[in-house]
Structure formats: C-alpha cells, structure tokens
C-alpha cells in the first residue's frame, strides 16, 4: 500500500477544512442576505402598490394620468390597471425596461406571485381598488433583476473569497507543515545514519516547538540508553568470553598433558584430571550465574512471591553455615520485631548467601561475620559485616557491575566470577529494595540491604 507523506496529508486536510468552513459560512451569510434583500424588494413593491391604491382614493379616475401613476412607482416597476371586467385601462412604468405580459392567469392568482419572463424574475402584486367612481384592480410588476444580480455577485464573491482563503491556507499549511515535519525528517535521517554508522552521532535540533524539542531529547536519551545497553552487552560478551576462555585453556592444557605423559604417569593423570574437573565446575558455576542474570522469568516475582520471615530465614541459614564453616564465627543481632517481606523464598536465600559467601572469601584472617536486622521507619534493614580486607573507595561504585573484581587474582584463586553481587543487586531491585555499602581498607565491609 502506497503511503502518503504527513506533510501532504496535513496540507490537504487543513486546506479542505478551511475551504469547507469558509464556504459554508459564506452560504449561511448569503442565505440571510438573500432573505433580507428579497423582503426589501417585496416591501418596495408593496409600498408602490399601496401608493397606487391611495392615489385612486384621493382623486377621481378621470383625473388620474400616467404621470400620476409614474410618481407612485419605483425603479424597475410597471403598473397595469384593470376594471372589474378585466379590461386594461392603464399600463405604464418609469422606464421601458419592464414589459411583462402577466397573462390571463392574473385573474385567478393570489395577491402576490413570482413569475419568470425571458430569464428575469418578477414580483406581481394584485391589489383590488374600490372607490365611489371606480371598481377594479391593479397589477404591480416589480423586476427582481437587480436583486438576482446582487445574489449572483454574492455567490461569486463567496467563491472568490473561498478560493483566496484556500490558497492562503494552503500556503501557510505548506510552510507550517514543512517546519513541523523538518525535525521528523531529520529524525528519520538520523536513524538511518545510526543504523549505518552506529551511535556516534546525536540529533541536534533546536526548534520553537516544545513537543518537537521534547521528541528530539527523548530520542537522544533513548539512543544513549540503547548505546549504553549495547556497550554493556558487548562488554558482557567480552567478559563472559574471557571468563570462559581461561578455564577452557587450562582444561585443554591438562588434556594435552594427559595425552603426552598421563598414560604412563598416574600422578600426572590424577593431578590433571582433578584440575580439569575443578575448572569444569568453575565453568558450570559461571554458566549457572549467567543464566540467573538473563533468564526470562526473573522479572516475574508476583506469581511465586510468598511471605518470607526474615529473621527465621537468617537463623536457618546461619545454622547451616556454622556446620559448613566451623572455623568462622557467625554473630547475629536480630530484632525482636517481626520482619516480613513478599518475595520468592529461594531469592532471599540466594541473595543472603551471596553476601555471606562474599564475606567469607574476603575475611580469611579474622573469620568473624556479623548479621544484624532492624526495623526503622517501616523499613526492614539487614546488615552483613565482615572484618576482612575491605574495598577501596574508588572501587565501591563498580562492585555490582558484572565480572567486576577488586582483586582479580585473589577472586580467581577463591573461585569468584564477579557475578554474585550483580545477581544480588538485581534480586533486591526486583523486590523494591536498595543496597548500601560502607567499607574501610583492612577493617572490613558492611552491606546494608533495605526493603
């Protein structure tokens, strides 16, 4: 289907609306003017007919002359006097332009009729005349030629006015629509450039229209977000590829070692297999964490949300952790108030264990971890504190980025992929919470989770 341009549609619609509106308005004006003018013509004819009647009452018929009759007539009028036997007695007019033969039907028509003769309309008024010395009637013939010419002129003026107004409207619409669509054309061209060249360029528009400027600003913001998302996706792929490449290279190296020496040396075979299995487990864990970040149902928290009793869940997890890490001291300071939150139970367990696991990894010396809960201004607050190496201030804004690790060598030796805190932050945000961090080098770190 062929699509029309917005500018052309705008011009056509506005022009047609203007033309129809003006034309209808002119027709209404002409209708009232016609009625007013017609009534004026009828009044003139009635006045002349009445003057003729008064003339016959003012003097005897024998004393009435054509000059007397003409004095009672207006322009473009003719008078014919008949006696009671329909015999014509007088016929005269002020000029020779009105010469209408009313015909025999004048004996039977009503007082006022309209007749067309040789392309001209006439009003004919029949007026009875009864005096002491005369009995008959008069026919006043009033030409409507002037009236018809005025009406025709009004129609021509209305049409001309409509055409002129339409041309002016079309011109204004063309200029205005060009100004309106120019930013849209620039926007379209910019999209084509971005599709071809990438996100380097931004839309630079400065118009007098707030809506267009808002559209341009929204487009630039959207492009910035898309560019940021694209860069994040590219960085994510690069980081994921890097994280997968290292264990795969290690596995490949040990498989080559097994192929070369492992067949004859059981010690080499055992060591290479153990390392390969360890690296394979690392890959499996990395893939699981990546799936956790990207799986489609992570945003649907309402369908499986349940009431989670925060203190009970923490006590249960701490009990298990004490069995798993007997060399660590886990202290709790849980509020006596009932803390509840609506979320998926496994998500709360997951984010809690992420922070505990992070504390364990970076507190290998003091091995003391404290968990505290409290209720403040209807906010449920969970604080997890370790006494480890701490996080430098310049790194604190980036620790929730995917694959970001403060000490890459230490994290790798401890099995970290740099995804745990990203997953925890995402879970917290999906459930309407927030997270804060407070850390000092060689003194420890406190993560504050707020729901």
From Swiss-Prot:
Catalytic activity line of the entry: ATP + protein L-histidine = ADP + protein N-phospho-L-histidine
Subcellular location: Cell membrane
GO cellular component, one term: plasma membrane
Main localization, broad class: membrane
Domain HAMP: 178-231
One example GO MF annotation: phosphorelay sensor kinase activity
Post-translational modification: Autophosphorylated.
Sorted UniProt keywords: ATP-binding, Cell membrane, Kinase, Membrane, Nucleotide-binding, Phosphoprotein, Transferase, Transmembrane, Transmembrane helix, Two-component regulatory system, Virulence
Record PTM Phosphohistidine, positions in chain: 242
Pfam families with a match to the protein in the record: ArlS_N, HATPase_c, HisKA
Gene3D superfamilies (alphabetical): 1.10.287.130, 6.10.340.10, Histidine kinase-like ATPase, C-terminal domain (3.30.565.10)
Transmembrane regions: 11-31, 156-176
Top-rank lineage group of the source organism: Bacteria
Enzyme class: transferase
Entry EC no(s): 2.7.13.3
Keyword hit for Endoplasmic reticulum: no
KW Cell division (keyword) present: no
Residues of the Histidine kinase domain: 239-451
Membrane topology recorded in Swiss-Prot or TrEMBL: Multi-pass membrane protein
Function of the protein: Member of the two-component regulatory system ArlS/ArlR involved in the regulation of adhesion, autolysis, multidrug resistance and virulence. ArlS probably functions as a sensor protein kinase which is autophosphorylated at a histidine residue and transfers its phosphate group to ArlR.
Protein name, entry field: Signal transduction histidine-protein kinase ArlS
Source organism of the structure: Staphylococcus aureus (strain MRSA252)
